[in-house]
Amino acid sequence: MQTLWDVLIIGGGPAGGLAALDCAKHGLRVLLVEQRLFPRWKVCGCCFNNQAQAILNSRGQNNLIVDSGGQALRSLRLGLRERETTLALPNGYALSRERFDQALIHAAIQAGATARFHVTAQVEAASPEYRRVRLKDHQSGATSHAKARVVLVAAGLTQRCLPKHEAGLSDIHQQSRHGAGCVVDDDSHHYPVGAIHMAIGDRGYVGLVRREDGLLNLAGAFDREALSQGKGAIDAAQHVLNQAGFPVPEAVQQGHRWQRTAALSRSTGVVAGERFLVMGDAAGYVEPFTGEGMAWALTAGAAATPFVLKGVERWTEDLETHWKSTLQLTIGRRQMVCRALSSVLKRPRPTALLFELVNRWPAVAEQIISSLNEAKLPSPKGEPCL
């Protein structure tokens, strides 16, 4: 007989992992499926700001980052046109996605969740009591079905888990940049631990941060045209670093392989439907800064539990409406700042003016960073927070 899960979560990133943990701690039967094997690397700045930490603390994971080896971040170093300025960065940490995501899933399993890896999921028909999901195990090749009262879709930027007639259309912003990243072994003194190093160029930007294992993580956002020329991300990154006056790590010069993402800035037409909620990057994304991307994902993961609890008891259209409002109020407002900043960074003259402002009056920039780091927890009752 098929198990009827209270909630089936598609995606083992921060949003899915935290939702699995929180739902399991509330006594729900939780199945999480992830298409890749863990640990796995992701194109990400691997930075956690105060909002991300506050969310983890609120779910009993106060020490998860530190216990996993997280490195404290105290400053943001900016480079533009061979000029530099450094700003204070409040209460940040750097931790590789390999360690963080695995630690979060491990905590969820300890709380009672079931996790399956190298498994893809396709949401199928809904019944009055549950949603049917087709699962494919890519190790054995076997296909099976699962039933869940609620499905959480946290499958990333380009998720295709929902039926076409329910998924809606993703609106990719016309000037959206594309992400690319890599991890390199770099023992130079140019990129010390404890800082986010951000190089800004006319066709993109690159963030560099030293991880807990000493490796250097590079993550950038580039114009599509920049990635289509020469050696793609390798040349695009070197161009940005050279423009900023930042040394190019030797491994990057030697052609170290980069991994690319789809277009970053996008909105999703459908974030909820009959017995499913869309969350994390799958619910819409903007080019993030100073750890905001991780904060958005964790905030969504924490916000989902009260909706799941209500949905397990009885699904209503009000849940779908309130979920959309909750995402807008808890995450959409935070994304507005990053959207405005990314818009400025696409235009050389406003970028230069902003850099001059930051250089002359760093307190103004530090106030903006503080606003991004301001912690706000989602409502424990699943009601929009005004």
Predicted segment positions?
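Beta1/beta-strand and adjacent pyrophosphate-binding region of the FAD-binding site
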Residues: 2-15
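Glycine-rich FAD pyrophosphate-binding loop
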Residues: 24-43
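FAD/FMN-dependent oxidoreductases across multiple families
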Residues: 94, 226-308
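C-terminal helical "tail/cap" subdomain of flavin- and related membrane-associated enzymes
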Residues: 306-386
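A conserved beta-strand/loop capping segment in the N-terminal third of enzymes
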Residues: 52-105
